[in-house]
């Protein structure tokens, strides 16, 4: 079967019964996996494409930005976008630095010309703080029925070999990344060429452990495995990086013949197997299926490849199992391979392995600055050509023109030489980008972020990467001119901590930090620092005197300020930190930032897992961002106190603790819980966000009996965190009434409530409250929690009339979406307690009549419940307008999308938060 596009590839592999599966592991669980046949993949991709076609503003050729945190969703929606006639663009994970993240998203929007963006509900907050891209959660798209490919509406012609199939980006979350257009023909030529390099045995599989935004994952593994009619296995990177032994276990378990690992991970495997070799009973893995461990992205150390190869040979792999190579996004990943490593490189006494010769579909040359080919052995600029090489960057004509020579060769930006056997050895880069653990990073972006740190003189910081002697991967160094005096040790330490945190948030790597004198940082006549000269001086040891002095001053400061644990949690965490990071007690205390001890991203992941394991927490209990922003034992212990401490009632729940503006206080809806606010809070990045949760959920707690009791509790909770105004409060549905009462109490004590929001609740509610008995409260709760549909909850209201509480509860649980039930960690007693809290909240408002007034109000209104009003217009003009009787100024009304129960749900939270933020700004908040 001749393949003219990627869709034909999937149809071909799906038509064969013996073509393999897509095996997917979830985060934190390498014991269980889900397996999908290629027929399953084709089926769900077509269903998803039909759902996509119904999306407004979508037409053939549209770019669809895919932003997912798991392999399966990326795979499904890549194919769905393709079958819908669109161009999928797979997004890398965003930077943890908010300003870099926002700038990156805005650049994506501009580059891709305002694309539709698909994501998951749980990571919608990645798009907080910006308006350039409005994400759509795929959970909101309805995938109905089975649709065959033949039944798809043919709204556009089948793509040809020259048509674009995929957009990938040249770098991760930092730097001005370019969109690389990969055509159907280019990708097919690439996977054909890769598969020709070395034959693989039958009944084996491919293993991938990086995100699908990486060209090696989607082309070298996902698409090549389909071309080879083999199973492909996808595992989250964190599970592999934090446990190299897991990598070996999966190679054995799935009879993997082809995978990849950059040099830094090869070094981790070598260290693991070296330690294993010293055990009384060393562990053995059956790796007889393993033929090909592609390695690239950074230089391969020959000694590392040699030693690891010896270990792998003992488990059944061939001596040349490690295959160093060269590839870029522009060449569909690896395209030049060294299939004779390590023997070829040992025979030439090479410190770093050659990357080998070209596969079919690509040619290389090394040239001088005038693009003249150089003879073998001479170092020059690496250039490539052939069917595997891309043709253009998306929406970037100038970058495309700059990337190619007049005779059509692609300028890689790498330096190297070709030896007499036609093997390429890389010697460096013509560009300044840094490659850390195989990922490109822009030093300019990092320097811009560093300039905001008080201890640095603006424009006098320089960031570069270097390969340390005996190292396994490049490391980052930051040199800077300090603003503090040399003997101000506290400022020296604070500046080093701030630099380390900034670089780690951007790159996942802890830098070497070195303050220098002005004389050591000369500028050119144009006022610029020379990165190349500074790097060369550092590598030659010209800054050794500064380095030794700085190390001694930092040691003295840490020694004089050593802090001991103040409680059991701090003591426990300190033990976990020192053991996990293999550091001594005298080098680390509860106030030492983890970045000071040389931690890298792999060690950070392992530390996170070790803490969770030691504290008996779930694998995802501690967000990585928490560990990065609470970088000392003491700070982390404080952040974890809520999880470790006793469950005493406190109405205040912190949803977002950072920001320079006054907090926003959100009062729970009639269900009493504040889960509904979590997604909304993640978009409010410039102020703390607190929620007020009803009493009665914890063991031994009794629900509030009166509105006055609840109001006083919430008032005290607010004043304990924010003693004085101006205040910003809002309530959702029932919570609007309580927010109104709290606002009155604050004003009665002389405080200013500058913003008071009502999310879709009128002032007069007692008649509606009286309609809600325990059964109705439970059914509303079930619908509110997505356990049952709105239609089913209405049907059950009739069906369950006259039944006991136990019978009603039995029916609700039997009708519940059990996956959602489990996701919420519900059980029968908890559901009963929740229904009791909801009922008591409604009961205490049976006789509620609003009274008094407040300064003003913002009313956010959506489509009302059918029982409340016949239309949105009636709801706004007849019911909600009555707030005018209880405000000293005319209320402001904000028309928002969605229905009563969905207005701040996943479908509409993005547009809602924009309206809310604007309303806060207009009120001077």
Curated annotation (Swiss-Prot):
Carrier domain sequence ranges: 564-644
UniProt entry tagged with the keyword Phosphoprotein: yes
Biological process (GO), any one: fatty acid biosynthetic process
Consequence of gene loss (knockout): Abolishes the production of aspulvinone E in hyphae, but not in conidia.
Catalytic activity: 2 3-(4-hydroxyphenyl)pyruvate + AH2 + 2 ATP + O2 = aspulvinone E + A + 2 AMP + CO2 + 2 diphosphate + H2O + H(+)
Family, per entry: Belongs to the NRP synthetase family.
Known tissue expression: ApvA specifically produces aspulvinone E in hyphea, in contrast to melA which produces aspulvinone E in conidia where it is converted to UV-protective Asp-melanin.
Protein name per its UniProtKB record: Nonribosomal peptide synthetase apvA
EC nos: 2.3.1.-
Domain of life: Eukaryota
Cystine connections: none
Pathway where this protein functions: Secondary metabolite biosynthesis
Protein purpose: Nonribosomal peptide synthetase; part of the gene cluster that mediates the biosynthesis of aspulvinones. The nonribosomal peptide synthetase apvA is responsible for the production of aspulvinone E, the core structure of aspulvinones. ApvA first activates 4-hydroxyphenylpyruvate (HPPA) through its A domain to AMP-HPPA. The HPPA unit is then loaded to the T domain and eventually transferred to the TE domain. Upon loading of another HPPA unit to the T domain, the TE domain promotes the enolate formation on the unit attached.
This protein's UniProt keywords: Phosphopantetheine, Phosphoprotein, Transferase
Modified residues (O-(pantetheine 4'-phosphoryl)serine): 601
Claim: Isomerase is one of the keywords in the record: no
Location of region: Adenylation (A) domain: 15-436
Annotated domain remarks: ApvA has an A-T-TE domain architecture. The adenylation (A) domain recognizes and activates the aryl acid substrates, and loads them onto the thiolation (T) domain. The thioesterase (TE) domain shares the missing condensation (C) domain function, and is responsible for condensation and final product release.
GO MF terms, alphabetically ordered: transferase activity; very long-chain fatty acid-CoA ligase activity
Annotated spans, Thioesterase (TE) domain: 663-909
